[in-house]
UniProtKB/Swiss-Prot annotation:
MF terms in GO: structural constituent of ribosome
Record keywords: Ribonucleoprotein, Ribosomal protein
Origin species: Amoebophilus asiaticus (strain 5a2)
A GO biological process held by the record: translation
Alphabetical list of Gene3D superfamilies matching this protein: 3.30.1320.10
The protein, known as: Small ribosomal subunit protein bS16
Amino acid sequence: MAVKIRLAKKGRKKLALYDIVVADQRAPRDGRFIEKLGNYNPNTNPSTVVLHEDKVIQWLFNGAQPTNTVKNILSSQGILLKRHLQIGVKKGAITQEEADKRFLVWKESKTQKPGKFKA
């Protein structure tokens, strides 16, 4: 059973909202899913993303593959960086404190940069 982290469409026509879910890749897009990990609202400026980070990282470690869109969302939220740093901690390449420090430096640099769109 191949498990994917993907978007499930909610909302109405021309005002779509998406749930970020873990589902079997053979299941319908809006149908059966294993677990809901968060939601994504592309209608706001900037887009709103709410995630349960611990659950997402756990599913990534268990082998779930994100789709391209979800991979971009996770990357912008820093989830993939956090997972990458945790792999380094497990292998003994860096300590947990150093991983936390690197993540905080990344998060601070991201908040200081101006966004793509100005309101």
